């Protein structure tokens, strides 16, 4: 039996690692151990419930306004104790969070192989996104198995000197999760407030580098788009960060056709996205998920580590400039050809069977 420990701490990690955990649980040659760090405890728990993931350990590190250094050090120390007790054959981490980096370091100190799910993404700008770009680069220096979502991310790793035999193009597990969560008969109170003929725009924005002036610029653009285009309704699940909530409430809080709602669980979000006309986001995971829904995505960032979607035509980088965001949205609202050029493309990120591939590759690697 191979003991495989899966470690994650945030909502996006939970969504993307849940299919892997389920695939591990369904394999009778594997002993799975699941650890959550609690980096985003309040937002993570609903994901665990939806996918029926029952952690064996919870570090419960969540504290208000703690620094990145404190998060990283608490995970590093907490994982030291768990790895000493469990002695897994391999540790799986995901993506680019502080949990990812600290867990990889702790496993390295214990001479335990690390498998990096969603390896090889790069912007080549260490401060964009911050701190994620450096987290994933450092994790990829430590890892032993690299599960790259696309050929481009695999090539990034090989160009950095990673052995080709240790790099595997698997697709992205978020597509596996999307197949699990979409429901044809989905209902939500938010949808009851929006006339079917209205064009629903789904907005998400929360990244550290966008907080403050960039976020305010985007929100003002959204406000004016709604005022000038009566067919538009905006749904914005507002992140729990006080820095996000205060600006959202100040600029968007009193507009009838802007619906500021609590953060949505993954089922609600995926199904609202599937019914949207357009999505604006600074999220990484959404850039991968939503092209499967044939919904155009405007990315509220200046850089992306997911250029495959841009190259495929499903995503467009628009940054946070007021005029640029406003023009991009209104172009898609009023130009059917432009809209169809973005909507009618295939998703380059996977087929929904990534988790199965990863488990198979782990078993091969450990033999």
Question: What would you call each of these model-derived segments?
Answer:
Residues 152, 316-367:
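Leloir-type glycosyltransferase catalytic cores
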Residues 40, 45-47, 66, 184-275:
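Donor-nucleotide binding loops and adjacent catalytic segments primarily
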């Amino acid at each position: 039996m191979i003991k495989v420990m899966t470690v994650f701490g945030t909502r996006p990690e939970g969504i993307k690692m849940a299919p892997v955990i389920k695939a591990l649980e369904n394999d009778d040659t594997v002993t799975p151990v699941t650890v959550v760090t609690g980096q985003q405890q309040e937002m993570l728990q609903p994901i665990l419930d939806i996918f029926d993931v029952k952690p064996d350990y919870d570090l419960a590190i969540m504290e208000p306004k703690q620094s990145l250094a404190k998060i990283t050090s608490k995970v590093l120390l907490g994982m030291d104790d768990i790895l000493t007790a469990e002695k897994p054959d391999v540790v799986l981490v995901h993506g680019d969070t502080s949990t990812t980096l600290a867990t990889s370091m702790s496993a390295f100190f214990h001479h335990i192989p690390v498998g990096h799910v969603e390896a090889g993404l790069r912007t080549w700008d260490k401060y964009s996104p911050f701190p994620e770009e450096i987290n994933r680069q450092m994790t990829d220096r430590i890892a032993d198995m690299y599960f790259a979502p696309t050929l481009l991310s695999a090539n990034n790793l090989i160009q950095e000197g990673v052995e080709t035999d240790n790099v595997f193009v698997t697709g992205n597990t978020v597509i596996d999760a999307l197949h699990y969560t979409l429901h044809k008969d989905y209902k939500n109170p938010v949808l009851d407030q929006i006339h079917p003929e209205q064009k629903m725009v789904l907005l998400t924005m929360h990244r550290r580098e966008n907080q403050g002036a960039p976020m305010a610029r985007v929100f003002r653009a959204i406000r004016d788009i709604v005022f000038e285009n009566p067919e538009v309704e905006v749904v914005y699940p507002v992140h729990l960060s006080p820095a996000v909530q205060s600006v959202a409430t100040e600029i968007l809080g009193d507009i009838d056709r802007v619906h500021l709602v609590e953060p949505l669980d993954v089922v609600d979000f995926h199904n609202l996205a599937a019914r949207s006309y357009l999505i604006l986001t600074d999220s990484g995971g959404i850039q991968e998920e939503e092209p499967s829904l044939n919904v155009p995505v405007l990315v509220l960032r200046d850089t992306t580590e997911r250029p495959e979607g841009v190259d495929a035509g499903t995503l467009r980088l628009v940054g946070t400039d007021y005029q640029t965001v406003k023009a991009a949205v209104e172009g898609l609202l009023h130009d059917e050809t432009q809209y169809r050029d973005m909507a009618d493309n295939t998703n380059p990120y996977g087929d929904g069977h990534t988790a199965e591939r990863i488990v198979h590759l782990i078993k091969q690697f450990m033999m």
